[in-house]
């Protein structure tokens, strides 16, 4: 009797790679004003008005924008902060 090899847990679930950076992504929503999103990017991340406006326009027109990158812990903190401001944000590994 021959036994077929099935997929192992390692093959099914992607394990985060420690050396791959993480990113915080802010998604478009129908609630927050563009001026408010720009304000949040300036006040929390310390971005210039021009950079904050560009990121806000990416969120508005493309539906999302990467607003920060770093370790998983840092990105979890940034996502929680965005939620605190009422923005929809997620994190993911930046696999290019």
From Swiss-Prot:
An individual GO BP term: protein catabolic process
Q: Which Pfam families match?
A: ClpS
Which InterPro entries has this protein been placed in? ClpS, ClpS_core, Ribosomal_bL12_C/ClpS-like
Q: Which family does it belong to?
A: Belongs to the ClpS family.
Q: What does this protein do?
A: Involved in the modulation of the specificity of the ClpAP-mediated ATP-dependent protein degradation.
Q: How does it assemble?
A: Binds to the N-terminal domain of the chaperone ClpA.
What name does the UniProt record give this protein?
Answer: ATP-dependent Clp protease adapter protein ClpS
Q: What is the lineage of its organism?
A: Bacteria, Bacillati, Actinomycetota, Actinomycetes, Kitasatosporales
What gene is behind this protein? clpS
């Amino acid at each position: 009797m021959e036994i077929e090899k099935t997929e192992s847990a390692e093959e099914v679930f992607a394990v985060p790679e420690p050396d791959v950076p993480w990113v915080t992504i802010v998604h478009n929503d129908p609630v927050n004003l563009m001026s408010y999103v720009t304000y949040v990017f300036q006040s929390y991340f310390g971005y210039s008005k021009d950079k904050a406006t560009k990121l806000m326009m990416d969120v508005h027109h493309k539906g999302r924008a990467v607003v920060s990158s770093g370790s998983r812990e840092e990105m979890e903190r940034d996502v929680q902060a965005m939620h605190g401001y009422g923005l929809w944000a997620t994190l993911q590994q930046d696999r290019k």
